[in-house]
């Protein structure tokens, strides 16, 4: 099953500026973890914002789980796209406990099922003992795990991660990368990881795509990762 399909996507911050993303096409299958590499300003983070519905393209089509979410005459709101996001700063609510941070994204789930889902997510990221803690009481790696649990809790079709390791020191980054790959594959989660660090994609991704001046891609310029 194709989980994300993008055709001829073009985006500019204004009509007077050159496109940040120009005629970009791409597809990925369910369960794949894809890395997006590129220099600053190449449109990596903008691509995630377009997929999630936080930006509107000039032209092009995006499908998520075979549902069209944007094209010339259609725009599905972000909350109805089945997309989960983990941001660079994790965006946890400081006044909420770990449990309440995860519960926040489950408002559409029947109340009787919410506690079970929180418990499942805490077990998945191995943070069961931190359920009553607040974000400021957690390390950077622990905060990232909770951000991941919150993003996965509503069962999104696709998870988007924007520079998820940039706030971690080198030693912690290496261990967290390994943990993240295990968690994503255990959850059979399709994921796009934006990063400037090739080591990130080599550690967890099935293949990578480099965004550059033309921002055009096809199957021939994907680089598939080799995992032990």
What is the predicted function of each stretch?
Residues 153-157:
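A short, proline-enriched helix->beta-strand linker immediately N-terminal to the Walker B motif
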Residues 52:
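Helix-to-loop junction immediately C-terminal to a conserved catalytic motif
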Residues 159-163:
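Catalytic Walker B motif of ABC-type/P-loop ATPase nucleotide-binding domains
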Residues 134-138, 142-144:
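Conserved ABC ATPase signature
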Residues 67-70, 112-130, 181-182:
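Conserved ABC ATPase "signature" region
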Residues 69-84, 108-111:
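ABC ATPase NBD coupling module
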Residues 188-194:
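Conserved H-loop
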